[in-house]
Amino acid sequence: MPDAVKVGFVPFATPARGTLIVFCDDGLKFGATATKALGAAVATVKRAAATAQFKGKSGSAMDLLAPEGLKVGRLIVVGAGKVASINDYDLLKLGGAVAGKIGAGDTAVTVVADLPTGAMKPEQAAAIASGIRLRAYKFDRYKTKKKDDENGAANASVTLAVADPAAAKKAFTPDSHVVDGVILARELVNEPPNVLYPEEFAKRAAQLKKLGVEVQILDVKAMTQLKMGALLGVSQGSAHPGRTVIMRWNGGKKGEQPLAFVGKGVCFDTGGISIKPSASMEDMKGDMGGAACVVGLMHALAARKAKVNAVGAIGLVENMPDGNAQRPGDIVTSMSGQTIEIINTDAEGRLVLADVLWYVAQKHKPKFMVDLATLTGAIMVALGTEYAGLFSNNDQLAERLAAVGQSTGEKVWRMPLGPEYDKQIDSQFADMKNTGSRNGGSITAAQFLQRFVDGTPWAHLDIAGTAMASPKNEINQSWGSGYGVRLLNQLVAEYYEAKK
């Protein structure tokens, strides 16, 4: 993985060099271990806090250089807010706040993992460590000249002083694999489109074989034999042929129904013949955020050896305008046999998903399918960049996604489906058309997808506002967020994974 930050766990001992980081609550109270670490410097910290009007609000920080009474070169006090009600996501963000304060010169950092309520539990320390790694990630491989202060936490060695290092390390190991999955998803979204085209994306997904994932790549010939006319129609205008990648992790009981996750992978979207405006078209390299999430999720499940059977499927295309490109007015036949009139070639993601959803439903007979797609600008108008749109034909699945959305901070908001919306995509010339009216655009897109799930319990996550170019936050400073990996990993772990 590209992040170079090293995170470890050690028994507590007051450091004699480097940077010391301690937590306080919103009353400027410290835990017993932090108080011991500060020693006589507690009075100095209190005076500095009064001068700086530092209150210990969650995520805030106060910085003291060469603090009197300590041997370290730098002391950072990070506010944890109201610690009595602190949860795992709060701790993840707190870890991000720690990473955000680490500078390029902080090569050795000690974080005292306790709060006024007591020493952090192993799982809490692991959440801090995960937040540090998530925040420290940077995508800068194409920069040939870097400023001295650009690396920050990425090159630091961070140790968390904990009550039980072995237990903390054990708790962090599976969490670290999930972080790896998030970072992998971010890497894929951040890559330029001249580097990450469908064939290259498929090759990177195939690297999951090293973790024990079965990977099958369908090329144009194979997809033609399967009659995937909807997906192939999108890719026919590109010099880079499309691919469908099927990944399978068999960590559950033999013969047990798998869970299925499907991702839209439009590696670059010009809009095709219905071409987009040039302004911000460069962002369309991220139109494969759903596919990136699925690959990152499969990495996480396999690396942590999740006790579940799971299928990940991604449809990979470029949507380009050339003499062979799909036209408005064309009618294509999907793998399901249903025909689709093309009204707008820029409504291409649903065409890709249509064939992949049908393939997975028919071939793997999953317990449920969750698809992720940067599908519509309409969902951003409705929900902004804080929530993904959730559409589902199954209340239990929707409720579970909403619950883990709250606990992980990768929030979803359920949107309606219904026959009144569905009839808007009926076509005069084919079974359906690929767009409805301007009104309710994200809903009619989801209605289109529902026609290809064949009755399988299903949820659609429209992640157009959350997968890329979303606001930077405590645990992500990257253009690509890796949204969905933690959400779906938690869904699996909490509701579907065999317990030990």
UniProtKB/Swiss-Prot annotation:
Signal peptide: none annotated. InterPro entries: Leucine_aapep/pepB, Macro_dom-like, Peptidase_M17_C, Peptidase_M17_leu_NH2_pept, Peptidase_M17_N. Its cofactor is Mn(2+). GO terms for biological process: proteolysis. Mn(2+) 1 binds at D269, D346, E348. It is found in: Cytoplasm. CDD domains: Peptidase_M17 (cd00433). The active site is at K276, R350. Keywords: Aminopeptidase, Cytoplasm, Hydrolase, Manganese, Metal-binding, Protease. Disulfide bonds: none annotated. It holds the Pfam family Peptidase_M17_N. Gene3D superfamilies: Leucine Aminopeptidase, subunit E, domain 1, Zn peptidases. The keyword Cytoplasm applies. It comes from the Bacteria. This is Probable cytosol aminopeptidase. The gene is pepA.
